[in-house]
Amino acid sequence: MDLEKNYPTPRTIRTGHGGVNQLGGVFVNGRPLPDVVRQRIVELAHQGVRPCDISRQLRVSHGCVSKILGRYYETGSIKPGVIGGSKPKVATPKVVEKIAEYKRQNPTMFAWEIRDRLLAERVCDNDTVPSVSSINRIIRTKVQQPPNQPVPASSHSIVSTGSVTQVSSVSTDSAGSSYSISGILGITSPSADTNKRKRDEGIQESPVPNGHSLPGRDFLRKQMRGDLFTQQQLEVLDRVFERQHYSDIFTTTEPIKPEQTTEYSAMASLAGGLDDMKANLTSPTPADIGSSVPGPQSYPIVTGRDLASTTLPGYPPHVPPAGQGSYSAPTLTGMVPGSEFSGSPYSHPQYSSYNDSWRFPNPGLLGSPYYYSPAARGAAPPAAATAYDRH
């Protein structure tokens, strides 16, 4: 079948094309195919030609052929769609009024709930109902109150006194600005100079708990304000801040020069001024600090004999294993002071408090005749006591 006998190719239809496709056919970028090409695609499809063969013979992309045929089978039209057009307007005045009415009745109503209600009340159908994003945009632009309008007086009672003070202090705009926080809330704030002066006074009167509000030489100079120190002392203090925090080998081995003696004397004179400033910055007084810190506490001295005779509650007295000897008398004499050491052999008190109750916290076990029968228990091994007291 010869398709190009009575039908011109797209190359001869238009001039000034935008490009050439993969099949060698020309096209104008962004514009639809001519109606004659569309009609020829439909005619070939009616003749039973496959879409891939139509695409190859007419030099039109396969996607374009499929799209044109699909639209023709659905609608019966070969006309192209609207290029650059928009959807029909769904936010009609009636729909906007209904959305505003729903929002006034229930301010916490979601956009999807408004959309479902519009469909339920037959205000819109499935084709004309606005989307959720469109409803949110309508509420934001047409239903809600614009920000430049004053807030009703009834909403002022919600704001507490503390929050009003904080909001007015945070706002840096002028009092007449409608876009500031004070302008939106209808709060008349004082002038900027008054706020700045109050902020400066608040910095001086309320330091942070550790006594240092802002580090650095500039802030320290601002706090001094030339009242506590002379100009010479301020220069010395500046040199101290400029000096390195860690001394190197040259500064540690270098002797003090004569011209540095005046500097050190001036630094010594800073002690009084720094003490006064620290007393003003710190919140508690030195007397309160001294009273809160406990003084030195005395602890009783435990001698060697008392330590040996002391046993922890719930534990048996210490018995060294067999074969381990005790300290001799000369050794104990060197370890214990003479006033505490009597010279008698080191012995342990009798085992009068030693029983089986410390090993068995459950009293029911002690009631068994097995633990109290001499045959079952047997005699205590005397080797431990003999090794303990043999000296």
Swiss-Prot record:
It is found in: Nucleus. GO terms for molecular function: DNA binding; DNA-binding transcription activator activity, RNA polymerase II-specific; DNA-binding transcription factor activity; RNA polymerase II cis-regulatory region sequence-specific DNA binding. The keyword Nucleus applies. Expressed in all B-lymphoid organs, in the embryonic midbrain and in adult testis. Disruption phenotype: Mutant mice fail to produce small pre-B, B, and plasma cells and therefore lack any immunoglobulin in their serum owing to a complete arrest of B-cell development at an early stage. Residues 19-75 are annotated as: PAI subdomain. Keywords: Developmental protein, Differentiation, DNA-binding, Glycoprotein, Neurogenesis, Nucleus, Paired box, Spermatogenesis, Transcription, Transcription regulation. This is Paired box protein Pax-5.
